[in-house]
């Protein structure tokens, strides 16, 4: 059976929960493109079954930050997904601050191992 991976392209294109904006870029647009690219890469491997939170760049989930997140989690849980990957592009005005973040629900799990190898 294929591993089910739910990719959440964080934030909405308008309305609630739109994310950061700067230098002509909108976080939700970058997240959408990265999510589609990642989904395409994973779909090329038959070991993975992939779903996205937003199937179009104009899709809006929820009516507030809380309901937007709840909608994404509900979609993943109702599938049910084995892994939930939420893509975000954080920023800071200080160019010396950079890096990536990975959060997992529990240590000593397959998800924890995967997070350490991303």
Where are these regions (language model features)?
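Short, intrinsically disordered, charge-balanced linker/junction segments flanking boundaries
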Residues: 114-118
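Catalytic-core regions of hydrolytic enzymes
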Residues: 2-113
